[in-house]
């Protein structure tokens, strides 16, 4: 059977075969490429994927010759190979492909003649072509021999070692033409290759060799130039100056409500994980890693999931006692349903219960209870009903549709779901806003279970917590930390005055919300309609494998991290990162010594806390020890044929893990993020900063990039997390991670004065006419400002020790200016208006634009290096500074 992929209509052929060698023919052929479907010569990637994949590695640098209007390069990316450069004779089709795949930054597109490739020798590990050499053959006298002009240039750009590695196997199996078709390797399309000759002349004329002309420097210079908007003055709007080009080149991908550096890097990490999990030769000595593959494959079994439909959830609801929306239910079982929904299946109706370090005694774990129970992202969506009418209507439609899919009747389902929504609105009314919960000293309340029972008597707390933490034995004297006593008291009163049928509907609705992502496409389609209203996503085209990677990361993230780290993480990165943290910590402590508002006793305690901050880089050590890794997931049963059951088993397993933690001290090996995560965090109860392997990559960090970019990228992230130890919440914890007052009153008053300046500054910023909440974002804004200052001071210290760096070619920036541009370009972002609104009401971070503008307008160093005068938009003349 012929293997043909979906293609556009076949274009007209040239009058003579030799026309295939003429660029004019190809330019004319591809005039409509930007608006047409891909066209595949011979067949698509699936036709030869099985032949090719055994020869590829996730980090191979791949060059695709004569890419044309084919989807091959994108399909290779989706197959788990992110580093792909594509060239074509036609500048018309190259422009079209750049536009079509602008949302995938690791796909690079260049206009080149394959007979004269402009890449340095050894640039690629794999070279692929599908029909390009056929075009060259139209001018050959012998149709079985490719002239040296094509083969030699391919041989030259291949990595020699990589070519030899595969030659012994391939030469015996394939002809010369097939060998080139099978191909072998890439890293780097130099985006400024057109300038290489001129730059080389300049280099030889300059005896100091002050311009860096390495491949890495040329490539990163090209990326920086692509992102800049030179039409905007840096003193007018530095975010637009730094990111205007990036924003033009990065329209929102379908199905996304936001797109930024973090999303892009996570997509790359996911592609690597996909390749690892779908490897047909997968073989591991770790049972946890084998569970990871089984879980992932169960998620991919779409036919099985569709076949089961809604039945798994219907059976579960019947097992719990029924749901008033869909049929008979047990009217006297509120506690039993609550225990099942919140205990066995870990949903969070009314409140959330978890085990974590006691903030006031951080060497021990304790039961903690906090507010919860709302499905929409924020209480604001429920309370401002006029402004959010579309969202509330879409949410009710979603509730009704799911109720109907599970067996509800048209005449009653909407009314019963409306009652559940009204209950959530009442919950929203008593939910405390996030900006009023920032003082942890005020919201922390330790009490016994007996005291909790007196506070919120509508349910039996000892019975509930004993079930939740079984087999542990609890008594009335067991300590519990409650965050928000007023909330729990009012929740208890709300439960008492609500009809049992509405309580049942609400509890089961919480279970339905948690489990429908494991069901068939009808439930996914229903959710997509709600997400379109809530976040502005136009349509979802997320491949199933990406959804399954995310699910696997949630379920078995550290076993998945073991695979990721072994495949990608350079151990030297850990040493380099630790060195950078030391430099940034030293810069922060030096700045502490110059703070005029802080008394000496508080300053000394702050220095001791900074010294005591423990840094965790890359991954926790246990993930590379198979037995230790297996022990972490011991007891979690995973099969390859039931994704829904795997998810139920996960909820039950996580409840057991939580119970197991209560009588144990907190462990430093217990990370809150998996190694592949593109993020970082500070944990006050451990006084530690954590930088997973996933973020120790470009654009945050690359070993052969200028230090200005590394300090402006990962350096600012490090400074940000370190400064969290001293933001409005972190500063309440001492060096041991305990919540206690350690500041002198005079310094505390001065601190609050300085942070009030930050709060007021950010409260003036607006997005689509809506003001930021400077109180809600205060901690992150303090960390952004302090992190930038610490990283820049660390960079200056590095320069004093090592001397000035070479400058990047063509960008026209000093290295000091480059530091600030590098920082800003980390935050280049696009977002729908709906998603922007959601961020304003839920996110403790300021929007990306103001993380740049707010921070840099407070930086004397930035204002000096860019010469921004007082009165310019970037220099109001009033600087807010805490650290």
Swiss-Prot record:
Its main location: Golgi. It is a single-pass type II membrane protein. Its EC number is 3.4.24.71, 2.1.1.-. Disulfide bonds join 212-217, 235-868, 243-828, 299-548, 757-880. Binds 1 zinc ion per subunit. The active site is at 721, 784 (proton donor). It comes from the Eukaryota. This is EEF1AKMT4-ECE2 readthrough transcript protein. Residues 1-178 are cytoplasmic. The keyword Translocase does not apply. The modification Phosphotyrosine is found at residue 39. The lineage of its organism: Eukaryota, Metazoa, Chordata, Craniata, Vertebrata. The chain crosses the membrane at residues 179-199. Optimum pH is 5.5. Inactive at neutral pH.
């Amino acid at each position: 059977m012929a293997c043909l992929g979906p293609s556009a209509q076949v274009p007209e052929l040239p009058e003579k075969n030799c026309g295939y060698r003429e660029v004019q023919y190809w330019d004319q052929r591809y005039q409509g490429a930007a608006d047409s479907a891909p066209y595949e010569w011979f067949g698509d990637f699936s036709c030869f994927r099985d032949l090719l994949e055994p020869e590829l590695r996730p980090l191979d640098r791949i060059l695709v010759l004569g890419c044309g209007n084919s989807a091959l390069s994108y399909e290779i990316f989706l197959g788990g190979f992110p580093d792909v450069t594509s060239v074509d004779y036609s500048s018309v089709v190259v422009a079209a492909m750049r536009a079509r795949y602008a949302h995938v930054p690791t796909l690079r597109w260049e206009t080149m003649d394959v007979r004269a490739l402009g890449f340095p020798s050894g640039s690629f590990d794999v070279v692929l072509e599908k029909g390009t050499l056929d075009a060259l053959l139209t001018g050959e006298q012998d149709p079985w021999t490719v002239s040296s002009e094509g083969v030699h240039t391919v041989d030259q750009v291949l990595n020699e070692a990589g070519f030899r590695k595969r030659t012994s196997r391939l030469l015996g199996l394939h002809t010369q033409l097939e060998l080139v078709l099978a191909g072998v390797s890439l890293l780097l399309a130099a985006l400024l290759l057109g300038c290489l000759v001129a730059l080389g002349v300049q280099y030889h004329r300059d005896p100091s060799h002050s311009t860096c002309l390495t491949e890495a420097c040329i490539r990163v210079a090209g990326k920086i130039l692509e992102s800049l908007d030179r039409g905007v003055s840096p003193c007018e709007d530095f975010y637009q100056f730094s990111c205007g080009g990036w924003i033009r080149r990065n329209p929102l991908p379908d199905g996304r409500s936001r797109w930024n550096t973090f999303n892009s890097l996570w997509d790359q990490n996911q592609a690597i994980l996909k390749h690892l999990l779908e490897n047909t030769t997968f073989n591991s000595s770790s049972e946890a890693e084998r569970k990871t593959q089984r879980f992932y494959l169960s998620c991919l079994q779409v036919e099985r999931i569709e076949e089961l439909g809604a039945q798994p959830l219907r059976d579960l609801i019947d097992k719990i006692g029924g749901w008033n929306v869909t049929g008979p239910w047990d009217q006297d079982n509120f506690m039993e349903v609550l225990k099942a929904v919140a205990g066995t299946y870990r949903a969070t109706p009314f409140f959330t219960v978890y085990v974590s370090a006691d903030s006031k005694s951080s060497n021990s774990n304790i039961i903690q209870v906090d507010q919860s129970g709302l499905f929409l992202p924020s209480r604001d969506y429920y309370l401002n009903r006029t402004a959010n009418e579309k969202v509330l209507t879409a949410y009710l439609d979603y509730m009704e549709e799911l109720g109907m899919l599970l067996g509800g009747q048209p005449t009653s389902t909407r009314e019963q779901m409306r009652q559940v929504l009204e209950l959530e609105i009442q919950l929203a009314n008593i939910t405390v806003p996030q900006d009023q919960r920032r003082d942890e000293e005020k919201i922390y309340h330790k009490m016994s279970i007996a005291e909790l029972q007196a506070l919120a008597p509508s349910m039996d707390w000892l019975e509930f917590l004993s079930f939740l933490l079984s087999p542990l034995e609890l008594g009335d004297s067991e300590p519990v930390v409650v965050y928000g006593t007023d909330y729990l008291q009012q929740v208890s009163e709300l439960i008492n005055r609500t009809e049992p049928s509405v309580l049942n509907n609400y509890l089961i609705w919480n279970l339905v919300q948690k489990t429908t992502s494991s069901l068939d496409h009808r439930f996914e389609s229903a959710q997509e309609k709600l997400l379109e209203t809530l976040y502005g996503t136009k349509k979802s085209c997320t491949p199933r494998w990406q959804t399954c990677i995310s699910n696997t990361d949630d379920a078995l993230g550290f076993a998945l991290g073991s695979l990721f780290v072994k495949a990608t993480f350079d151990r030297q990165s850990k040493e380099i990162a630790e060195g950078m943290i030391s430099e940034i910590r030293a810069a922060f402590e030096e700045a502490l010594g110059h703070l005029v508002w802080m008394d000496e006793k508080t300053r000394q305690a702050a220095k001791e806390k900074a010294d005591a901050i423990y840094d965790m880089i890359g991954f926790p050590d246990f993930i590379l020890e198979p037995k230790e890794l297996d022990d972490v997931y011991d007891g979690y049963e995973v099969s390859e044929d039931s994704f829904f059951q795997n998810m139920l088993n996960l909820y039950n397993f996580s409840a057991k893990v939580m119970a197991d933690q209560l009588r144990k001290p907190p462990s430093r090996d217990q990370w809150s993020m998996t190694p592949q995560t593109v993020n970082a965090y500070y944990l006050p109860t451990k006084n530690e900063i954590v930088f997973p392997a996933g973020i120790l990559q470009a654009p945050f960090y690359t070993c052969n990039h200028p230090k200005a970019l590394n300090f402006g990228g990962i350096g600012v992230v490090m400074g940000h997390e370190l400064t969290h130890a001293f933001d409005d919440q972190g500063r309440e914890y001492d060096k041991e991670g305990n919540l206690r007052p350690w500041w002198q009153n005079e310094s505390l008053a001065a601190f609050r004065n300085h942070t009030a300046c930050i709060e007021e500054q950010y409260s003036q910023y607006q997005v689509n006419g809506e003001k930021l909440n400077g109180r809600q974002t205060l901690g992150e804004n303090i960390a952004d400002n302090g992190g930038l200052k610490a990283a820049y001071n660390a960079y200056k210290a590095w320069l004093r020790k090592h001397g000035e760096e070479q400058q990047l070619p063509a960008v026209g920036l000093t290295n000091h200016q480059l530091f600030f541009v590098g920082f800003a370009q980390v935050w280049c972002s696009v977002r729908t208006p709906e998603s922007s609104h959601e961020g304003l009401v839920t996110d403790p971070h300021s929007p990306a634009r103001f993380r740049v503008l707010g921070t840099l307008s407070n930086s004397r160093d930035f204002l000096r290096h860019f010469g921004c005068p007082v009165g310019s938009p970037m220099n109001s003349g009033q600087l807010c500074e805490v650290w």
